[in-house]
Design a protein with these regions (language model features):
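Conserved class I S-adenosyl-L-methionine
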Residues: 2-49, 63-67, 81-84
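A conserved beta-strand element that flanks and buttresses the S-adenosyl-L-methionine
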Residues: 112
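C-terminal helical/coil "lid" or tail adjacent to the Rossmann-like core of SAM-dependent
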Residues: 3-29, 192-249
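Core SAM-dependent methyltransferase catalytic element
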Residues: 188, 254-266
Length: 266
């Protein structure tokens, strides 16, 4: 799921050998109970008005935008995703950079971004843009996993920590950003800043899209010169033993950060 230059495939969907793979990946995740439940919470926080206009940054295939119960403008950097969301019924999707949104100031009644900031080259700029385009009093919600919170039952915890840390620090642009979002919201002068933490606990290795390729992470690190052959062999052997024994358990925390644009600008 990671390109040779270190960028995650979601940062360059249109350049991938098979862009449809990433469409399929989103569909699989949307089918998981954990994802459905926290997305319902995001909708509740937004409390969209049927007559309002809302923005989703990183709209993907448009699944969330289509069920929010209001007019939604989707933004995605990928033309593949924009076309797919339009084909599924989203009325408006714009191919654009999250750090340079093509909208006037103060036109949106609310906005959200789900699992997108972890991939952005300039996440702080993107947050500033969300604040800029919403109306005073509007709600902003950003959701991301924080891979610094990963835990895994594994016989060799030192090796597991090494592999999981590689995922957090090197397989994503902003793998541990989620824990900082509260401070960023405060610095952006948003009101009523709130953070909710939800733990994704996986007990079967084939669920959640094969846990995002967890078994392959060590070999990816090897390819970048960051892990030895011996460590990779040991990781894969122990991983297979854990799975065969029915002892697999991996977890990561998602952070739902929300706030309101002040009615009176400070």
């Amino acid at each position: 799921v990671t390109a040779p230059d270190g960028q995650h495939g979601f940062t360059r969907v249109d350049e991938e050998a098979r862009p449809a793979f990433w469409v399929e990946c989103l569909d699989k995740l949307h089918g998981e109970p954990f994802y459905r439940e926290y997305k319902e919470r995001v909708r509740a926080i937004l409390s969209p008005r049927p007559t309002g206009l809302y923005l989703e940054v990183g709209t993907g295939v448009g699944t969330d935008a289509l069920v929010i119960g209001a007019r939604v403008v989707g933004v995605d950097r990928s033309l593949t995703m924009c076309r797919e969301s339009l084909a599924r019924g989203l009325r408006t999707c714009v191919a654009a950079d999250a750090g340079a949104l093509p909208f006037p100031c103060g036109v949106m009644d609310g906005c959200w971004s789900d699992r997108t900031f972890q991939h952005l080259a300039h996440p702080r700029r993107a947050l500033d843009e969300l604040v800029r385009v919403v109306k005073p009093g509007a709600t902003i919600v950003v959701v991301d996993p924080d891979y610094g919170t990963q835990e895994m039952e594994f016989p060799d915890q030192c090796l597991a920590e090494k592999v999981l840390n590689f995922r957090a620090r090197h397989m994503l642009r902003n793998g541990t950003l989620a824990r900082q979002m509260r401070q960023w919201f405060v610095e952006a002068r948003l009101d009523d800043v709130c953070v909710e933490e939800r733990a994704l606990i996986v007990r079967h290795p084939t669920s959640v899209d094969n846990v995002m390729g967890l078994r392959s992470w060590a070999r990816t690190a090897l390819g970048r010169g960051m892990m030895s052959d011996a460590d990779v062999d040991r990781w894969e052997s122990l991983y297979d033993d854990v799975v065969a024994a029915g002892r697999f358990r991996w977890s990561v925390s998602f952070f739902i950060t929300s706030g309101h644009k002040p009615v009176v600008q400070r």
